[in-house]
C-alpha cells in the first residue's frame, strides 16, 4: 500500500472512531491566578455565548443535571451552541468550555463523601 493510501486510511479510521463515542469536557478542578489557587465551586450551562445571559436551569431541583438533546437541536437550528461555565472560589475569573455537539448530558455537584466540586458534559 502506498504512503498516501496508508495516510488516507489512517485518517479515516481516526475520524470515524471519534464519531462513535461522545467527547467529554470537564471543568478544571483548580484555577491558578498569580500566586493563588482557586478551587472549582460552581458551574452553569448556557445556550449561546455566556455574555448573552442565556443560562439554562437544571432538569430538577435535587441534582445538577442537564439533559441536552432538545438544547442541542435548538442550538444547531439557531446557531447557539452550549457552553459550560466553570466558577471558582474567591475570584470572578471563569473557564468557558464549548459543549461538544455529541454530548448528551452535563452534570455538576459534590463528589460522594467529599468537598470537591465537579462539572462535566459527555
Show the residue positions of the predicted features.
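Mitochondrial intermembrane space
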Residues: 21-122
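Intrinsic low-complexity, intrinsically disordered segments enriched in polar/basic residues
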Residues: 1, 20-21
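N-terminal signal peptide c-region/cleavage motif recognized by signal peptidases
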Residues: 15-19
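Bacterial N-terminal signal peptides that target proteins for export
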Residues: 1-8
